[in-house]
Amino acid sequence: MFVYVNTPLVVMIWQNYDDNLFIRLGQYLASGHWLGPYSQFTLMKGPGYPAFLAANYWSGLPITFTQGLFCCLALAALSLVTFRATRSRLVALAIFVVPLLDPRVFEVSRVLRDCIYFSQSILIIAVVSYCLFLSNGIRTRLISAIIAGALFGWFWLTREEGVWLLPAITVLGLFALLRKKRYSEACKILPPALIGTGAFVLVLVLFATINFFIYGMFIGVDFKERNFQAALSAMESVQIAKPIPYVNVPRAARAQIYAISPHFAELRPYLDPNPGPSPWEAGDCLHRPTACGDIGNGFFIWAVRDAAAKVGVYKSPKDASRFYKAISKEIRSACTKRQLRCVKNFVPYMPRMTRSQIEQIPRSAIELLRDMVHPGMYSKFADGHVTGPKDEFRSALDFLNYPLHYPISNSHFTAVAIRGWYHDPKIGDQWFSVTVSDKGDKALPFTLIRIASPDLVESQHDENATQQRFSLRTQCGAGCVLHFASADGGTRDVAISSSTALTAQYLPIGSGLLVFDSGAVENEATVYDDGRVRLASRIRAVLYPIFEILLPVLLGLGTLSFFGGCYMAVRKRNYPIILAVAAACWVSVLTRSVILVLIDVSSFPAMITPYLLPIYVLSVVASILSLSVMRKRWTFVDQTGTATQTSDTSCVDG
């Protein structure tokens, strides 16, 4: 918790499709205005994380503390299940502590849904396991089923690819059936399964129902809306002579679609402006060279939505749905009439791949495996990228309850106050001019006051030097410089560093003399000066080499132990709870890995920490559980919690 809370947050308020979107939706929820006025952004992504942000705002706790606490609670729940199943305090403690020490958990220091997504997956596996294996009595079992279903509904509305956790839940159900000796006992699993499913469906129906009353359409996340997906599928089905990797709807295909689809042609000024390139063309170019000069798969969906919003499509969900339905219908009709050459894509939600992309699957899988085993070295986030309007930045910080954060790049955290005098005997009482600048602004505001100077009349023997003293005050940020200019064209720049550098300074400017009698530079304390942040950074730096050694051993032995445990379980027909939970975790790792590899080779780079976090944590948990299964002497625990020792290598039975 200390490291999590004291890892500064990077508040990217310019990220309208991620960080700022979640903050804005959360602010609407917290103020009681649902998800706000309808636009292309309103239902673009699920409200799971904005709801968490809203709840955090009401709690008054910094968002980093709440997210860290949620991670601890999820691991504590799984640790409790582990203890109930094994009666081993050591294994339960390892389940709680080792994932928390994984330095990769702290890498996502942004306002992203991925910060809670891995915790949600752990908590769901823990609650489902408790419901199926450890709950005593019908009432407890049904309540835990409702909680599990509601959690899965929340999980489903947090990211769009929640299907990857379904196989893990199925595995837990299969183990529960295998552990039942009689048909009548197996039937007892059905009621909680149905109730949990009902709670899951109820969450989704409730979300769509509220959208119906607020926005006029029974709809969930409109990214998955039927007509929107049909339109995308229709666009991607249009073929050109030579397919371009990572560009399923290239400019040549768009030109053909414009010709036969009046509705899609409305988007042409924004997708393919004339003259000039589309602003979306640069998005995929850095990582996908074949996409340079065109709109790559990773950005095409957002480009279409953005263009549709600019032509007024997103007045309501119904208007947007009708628009995309018309595009789909026009393209399908042209395909049927052979006006377009089309090939149907039979894999929903996944762009079509060329042969060269398919050949990249092994490379992507190896990269994922390498990232799992080797955490790399500690690298500080590029905090200098925090930019945006200051009022929005302050509003976001207030909503997030002021966590430790990197300051905005154009923050004025240096206060400068100078007192002195200026005299030029050649020009009498004429005055100098001054401007103030820093890295973010070339013309900062300042206050310059002329003060009576009878002492200078006498000391300089100039009867015109009656108002030559001054007081100068300003605020600036990094790279602060004072630019002085005299009436005769002389200039002098003074870089602000410390009060000492401004005191008793004599600066010739042209034919005049500028004197600083005293100067004060007060730097507002920032995250860079916080000892807690420096300590947390050192702890993270120490953890990376430790896990660089630990992970290959832990994951390697964990994998072998899992297969050994499965072999023993099948041979003895004894299916312990701990093996069931380990299997669920390993299956989750596998299914999410498959999804990320397919995304990586078909669309945008997916081997990044935010997407990989569930794999990182679940693989560590699965390895620890698998190792506990293969102990020399197995603890045999019955449903009542009584533990006995066996002389052979039997499996743990909860």
What does each of the following model-derived ranges do?
Residues 59-66, 329, 334-415, 519-585:
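Membrane-interface anchor segments at the N-terminal boundary of transmembrane helices
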Residues 144-159, 200-202, 207:
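Membrane-interface alpha helices of multi-pass inner-membrane proteins
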